[in-house]
């Protein structure tokens, strides 16, 4: 089969039967005689969009088995197709047409999955409805044939033959590292992911992620490419460095989109895509625009205008977010399912305000100006010295700009060791990550005035995540050592080595007595920070933590 013409399969009329899977009850009609329509080749449902795209879905298991655009089949590698997880297995698959829309419905246990095509479009719209944990559904993967979009991006390991870690982090001969984890992007940073080349662009436009988990700053794999082929992902629930429980319900649409080499149309992006044409298709869990509401805030006071602010909504059923306007903090978050949500205001990625808001169908909940108490922002506290900024990220620290798209062993990384002198480019000199087996025991040198040295002070260390319960214990001038702090709740998976510092922000506080300080104002005080834990292994997989900020309060 090549392109949308000259097909060997014949068109057939679809008649709804009593055993049709969920989602087809609202569909009826006969396939059009024109190019747009569907057919059955005995093993697959074949859909011609009437544009330049023809695709096939297995009647047995719901896999996407062929994806032909302008005569080239892009789908599959290594004998594997495109599907939920690694394939659902035997499923009930049905098809129907309603006017200019064709819907394929896949039922597997409690899970429902849908493919929709619209006449004249080079797009496939997908939805996935997770009812519970009985069917594993962490992702949809679009597998792409090898050699079609060759590249050497951070998430492509085609040219990286040496395994560095866990069979998913690799090194090139020049010492640069590559991994499917190294997208370098938070969910809120991207609308689409894919490749372009040879006058063709192939993309997945993400959904609004309302049923995913982790919030706006979550980082996960988005795509990969190896010598075998490539993969584009829609994340349904990813456990890597995850901070939230799994949500259930219908997620979508996410869109497989072909272009002539450019980016996909912004009309497909989350927050802009309208799907009123899907309202009557009968998909399980579907809620149209009329059944959703909006939250609008007139402003946010108490902000530090040097930082971006994000407003998040979350409850066990759904999550949403939106950016606050830089000038006044105005925000508007639409397409929200009815319910009561925790509203969180983030300075950068640091939560500085929480409240509650209730959303109703077809309604707008308008909030008066949200006032962030000064004490909620640790950056407002008066400090003798401060390393980094209190923004919930390691930004500005040594190697921080590299670690979302490279392994710590990457040749481009500056040395992870080395001591720090306050007043001498201290933030850029301090490593963004500390590990028990790599750079534990880092020393920070600083001076105090006589008056400052005569008083006790609070030392704070903010972290953004930890691996294997790594947490900081401090010693001052080899005369005073803090207790070992209890480990805060953090994800249990790898994080620091696979492109993510995003766990649970936590601040450790240490009350340092006056007797610990040097009495000579001309001498340096020495702070030693050790990473302690009874877990972890060695090297970059020893217990570790990511730094947000360190300061000594006045």
Q: Over which residues does each language-model region extend?
A:
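N-terminal secretory signal peptides
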Residues: 1-9, 18-27
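Beta-strand-rich recognition/accessory modules
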Residues: 192-286
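Beta-strand-rich ligand-recognition modules
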Residues: 439, 445-454, 462-554
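A short, solvent-exposed beta-strand micro-motif common in secreted/extracellular proteins
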Residues: 329, 339-349
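A short, amphipathic beta-strand motif
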Residues: 293-303, 329-331, 369-370
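Extended, loop-rich substrate-binding clefts of extracytoplasmic carbohydrate-active enzymes
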Residues: 77-129, 139-141
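Structured interaction patches on ligand/partner-binding surfaces of diverse proteins
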Residues: 349-368, 372-375
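Short amphipathic beta-strand segments in non-cytosolic proteins
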Residues: 308-327
């Amino acid at each position: 089969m090549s392109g949308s013409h000259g097909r060997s399969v014949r068109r057939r009329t679809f008649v709804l039967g009593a055993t049709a899977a969920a989602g087809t009850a609202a569909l009826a009609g006969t396939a059009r005689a024109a190019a747009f329509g569907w057919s059955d080749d005995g093993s697959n449902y074949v859909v011609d969009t009437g544009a330049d795209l023809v695709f096939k879905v297995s009647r047995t298991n719901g896999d996407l088995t062929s994806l032909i655009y302008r005569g080239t089949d892009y789908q599959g590698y290594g004998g594997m197709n495109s599907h939920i997880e690694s394939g659902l297995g035997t499923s009930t698959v049905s098809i129907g047409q309603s006017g200019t829309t064709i819907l394929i419905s896949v039922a597997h246990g409690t899970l429902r999955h849908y493919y929709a095509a619209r006449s004249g479009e080079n797009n496939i719209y997908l939805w996935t409805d997770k009812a519970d944990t009985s069917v594993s559904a962490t992702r949809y993967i679009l597998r792409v044939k090898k050699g079609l979009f060759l590249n050497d991006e951070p998430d492509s390991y085609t040219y990286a033959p040496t395994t560095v870690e866990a069979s998913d982090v690799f090194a090139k001969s020049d010492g640069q590292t590559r991994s499917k984890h190294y997208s370098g992007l938070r969910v809120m940073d991207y609308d689409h992911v894919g490749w372009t080349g040879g006058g063709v662009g192939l993309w997945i436009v993400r959904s609004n992620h309302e049923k995913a988990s982790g919030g706006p700053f979550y980082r996960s794999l988005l795509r990969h490419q190896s010598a075998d082929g490539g993969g584009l992902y829609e994340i349904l629930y990813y456990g890597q460095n995850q901070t939230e429980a799994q949500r259930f319900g219908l997620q979508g649409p996410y869109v497989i989109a072909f272009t002539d080499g450019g980016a996909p149309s912004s009309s497909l992006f989350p927050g802009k895509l309208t799907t009123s044409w899907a309202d009557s298709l009968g998909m399980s869990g579907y809620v149209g625009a009329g059944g959703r509401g909006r939250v609008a805030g007139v402003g946010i006071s108490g902000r530090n205008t040097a930082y971006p602010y994000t407003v998040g909504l979350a409850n066990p059923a759904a999550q949403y977010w939106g950016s606050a306007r830089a000038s006044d903090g105005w925000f508007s978050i639409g397409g929200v399912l009815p319910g009561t949500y925790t509203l969180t205001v983030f300075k950068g990625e640091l939560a500085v305000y929480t409240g509650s808001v209730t959303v109703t169908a077809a309604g707008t909940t308008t909030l008066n100006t949200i006032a962030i108490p000064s004490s909620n922002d640790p950056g407002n506290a008066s400090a003798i010295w401060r390393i980094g900024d209190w923004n919930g990220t390691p930004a500005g620290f040594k190697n921080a700009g590299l670690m979302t798209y490279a392994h710590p062993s990457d040749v481009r990384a500056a040395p992870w060791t080395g001591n720090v002198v306050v007043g001498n480019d201290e933030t850029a000199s301090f490593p963004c990550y500390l590990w028990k087996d790599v750079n534990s025991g880092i020393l920070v040198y600083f001076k105090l005035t006589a008056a400052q040295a005569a008083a006790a002070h609070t030392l704070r260390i903010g972290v953004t995540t930890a691996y294997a319960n790594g947490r900081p214990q401090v010693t001052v001038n080899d005369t005073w050592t803090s207790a070992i702090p209890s480990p805060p709740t953090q994800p249990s998976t790898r994080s620091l080595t696979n492109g993510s510092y995003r766990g649970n922000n936590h601040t450790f506080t240490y009350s340092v007595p006056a007797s610990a300080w040097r009495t000579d104002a001309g001498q340096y005080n020495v702070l030693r920070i050790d990473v302690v834990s009874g877990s972890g292994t060695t090297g970059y997989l020893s217990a570790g933590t990511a730094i947000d900020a360190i300061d000594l309060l006045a």
